[in-house]
Amino acid sequence: MKDFIWKSKFYFAHFSQNLSQHRFLSLCATTSFYFLFTLIPFIILIFLILSKWVSNSDIIFNELQNITSNLLPELSGKIMLQVKKFTDNSKGLGWFWFFILFWAASPLANSLRKNFLIIFNKKIKRKFYVNKFIDIVILLLVIFLFFIYIFISKYLVDLAGLFHTLIPISEKSVVLILFSSISLIMFIAIFFKIMTPEKKLPQSLLLVGAAASCIVWIFLHEMFDLIMSMSQSYGIFYGSMRNLFISLIWLFLNVAGFLFGIELIAFIFNLEVYKFRSLFLHPSKSLLKIFFHSHIIRLQKKEVLFSYDSPSTSVYFIVDGQIKTTVHGNERLFHNNQYFGELSVINNTKRLGEAVVVSDWAKIIKIPNSTFKKLLSEDLEFQNYVLRNLNKIIIN
């Protein structure tokens, strides 16, 4: 039980630290602003494109109205009225207007793309027109997912009714919620797959993040009536701006639910890196026992860890015992909670010396060079820690 509590605290502390480093609330606020700014041209764009694929445009309009009301409950009526007026007065729009609508809606895609880069600690430099092209491709993919979602939602009620007929003990409403949740999770996972800059993410991890976002949205949906009842007093302070204030808060919460799933994916994907980071910066008996028990290698006296000109595949962390390194005739002794072998890994060279166990026995942990380099490139505190140790080596 103590191990479970310690592990839970570790996960919570590092996940909270991630949210703080990424300025999660600022990301949510920025994305919410861009979403509000580009919502009308984006909805018009979706309506115009999907109307060409579906014979009955009223179905598209009603589905978009439902989606908009979930995001901006107090403003959805005015937004959809504006969409209706624009589309009624702009029959037969040419390619120029489609280009204008894409350009007006692209800041939302740009904001989402940058959020993914921030959360996954990636830096990709591209030219302006390349980024704009990618943003337009993202918008097209989002519109395609909207089309698939609307197409499937038309048949969800019939599917739930069929399932209820086959299995009478199942409640139709429960089955409908289940099918809707599964389809929503699949669409979110596909969107995550398209947007993520990390191409090595396992499919199961994408589904976990999508499920987390879906659960948050379901929870918000259940809390909607409570939030709306609490908002009655806002009119005292905001007057005629009350509806806008409520819609902005609700939009912010929904965006936070979406980005929460992405944060969870990035956290789980980098979990091993966080464990090794704690091993270097905050070593403890609990950490070694819970996370690194299977990683510990026991060595006897005079065993050689590496020799001159051997490949640099790992950095070594000493759990217990003493290790002596010899580089160009200079000997150095390493003890508990110290590490060695990082210079060859950093410089991408072969070993410049050898390392031998000098105590009766020693316990070490191998840190893969990819993990060490990732920590060195992404974590400022770890960079300072390594630089201080390198400075000590130079001075001595």
Per-range role (PLM):
Residues 73, 360, 380-381:
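Proline-centered flexible-loop/turn and helix-kink motifs
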Residues 1-311, 316-317, 323:
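Membrane-embedded alpha-helices and immediately adjacent juxtamembrane helical segments
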Residues 365-368:
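NUDIX/MutT-family hydrolases
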Residues 235-239, 334, 346-349, 380-384:
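Short, conserved loop/turn and helix-capping segments at secondary-structure boundaries
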Residues 297-299, 303-360, 372-374, 387:
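Cyclic nucleotide-binding regulatory domains
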